[in-house]
From Swiss-Prot:
UniProt family annotation: Belongs to the transferase hexapeptide repeat family.
NCBIfam families recorded: dapD, PRK11830.1
Record field: catalytic activity: (S)-2,3,4,5-tetrahydrodipicolinate + succinyl-CoA + H2O = (S)-2-succinylamino-6-oxoheptanedioate + CoA
Entry protein name: 2,3,4,5-tetrahydropyridine-2,6-dicarboxylate N-succinyltransferase
Disulfide bond is among the record's keywords: no
Organism name: Brucella suis (strain ATCC 23445 / NCTC 10510)
Gene3D superfamilies: Hexapeptide repeat proteins, Tetrahydrodipicolinate-N-succinyltransferase, N-terminal domain
């Protein structure tokens, strides 16, 4: 689509969102068409909820998040076929693969292992691999990414090129509050098994998270080499493991419970990453 078309879509979505209390399953016309077109563009990867700028910052297209939210008001619950044992689901969001044949899969160019679930409006780039996993609406999974077994990519999350989300990883979705940005895993990151990155946090390019690392907006991310503490963002090429920090003493005592933190144990640039296995990087 041309820029004027996108500008028109954005204007319609913004106006509709301001008047969302009057929008329901009976709504027809311009609003419904704009929402449906926005979701199709997201599904094709022609637009995305967040885009990285030349300065490294991420610009969030809030109007696309609003389009996703409006779709819940517009669409009724309905039977969705394809459940185990010829059963069905009951939901408002169809599968990305609804009506697909071999032709669509070949054109898309990614691998979808049985029992992976991808909702309509999520984009999956060529050469990505989806093990039995869940990718929520509005998400963007870039080229060569591996979404391993039982991993979850939340709504509007951005997964970069060649990212590996190990088994059971959770990447949080962010639709509301509206001003919040999506959770972002930049290119060439490795996220260890059962780790969680949520609340719109960003893991910068080339970083490695060990198994069981949990990062939210309030999590202290401590650089062991410098003592610097980060919140909400893992710096580029960081190697991060789970750790603890001393807590405040309990009243009347000289001890207190330790508190969870994430620890940057080293920095591994692109050259080091290419020559070193993940297990070696995570050894202290």
């Amino acid at each position: 689509m041309t820029k004027p078309d996108l500008a028109s879509l954005e204007k319609t979505i913004e106006k509709a969102f301001d008047q969302r209390d009057g929008i329901n399953t009976a709504t027809r016309g311009e609003v419904r068409e704009a929402v449906e077109q926005s979701l199709i563009l997201l599904d094709r990867g022609e637009v995305r909820v967040a885009e990285k700028q030349a300065d490294g910052n991420w610009h969030v297209n809030q109007w696309l998040k609003k389009a996703v939210l409006l779709s819940f008001r517009l669409n009724p619950m309905e039977v969705i076929k394809g459940g185990p044992g010829q059963s069905s689901w009951w939901d408002k969001v169809p599968s990305k693969f609804d009506g697909w044949t071999a032709n669509e899969f070949e054109k898309a160019g990614f691998r979808a292992v049985p029992n992976c679930i991808v909702r309509h409006s999520a984009y999956i780039a060529p050469n990505a691999i989806l093990m039995p996993s869940f990718v929520n609406l509005g998400a963007y999974v870039d080229k060569g990414a591996m979404i391993d077994t039982w991993a979850t990519v939340g709504s509007c999350a951005q997964i970069g090129k060649n990212v590996h989300l190990s088994g059971g990883v959770g990447i949080g979705g962010v639709l509301e509050p509206m001003q919040a940005g999506p959770t972002i895993i930049e290119d060439n990151c490795f996220i260890g098994a059962r780790s969680e990155v949520v609340e719109g946090c960003i893991v910068r390019e080339g970083s490695v998270l060990g198994m069981g690392v949990f990062i939210g907006k309030s999590t202290k991310i401590v650089d062991r080499a410098t003592g610097e503490v980060f919140y909400g963002e893992v710096p580029p090429y960081s190697v991060v493991v789970a750790g603890t920090m001393p807590g405040k003493n309990v009243p009347g005592e000289n001890w207190g419970p330790s508190l969870y933190c994430a620890v940057i144990v080293k920095r591994a640039d692109e050259k080091t990453r290419s020559k070193t296995s993940i297990n070696e990087l995570l050894r202290d």
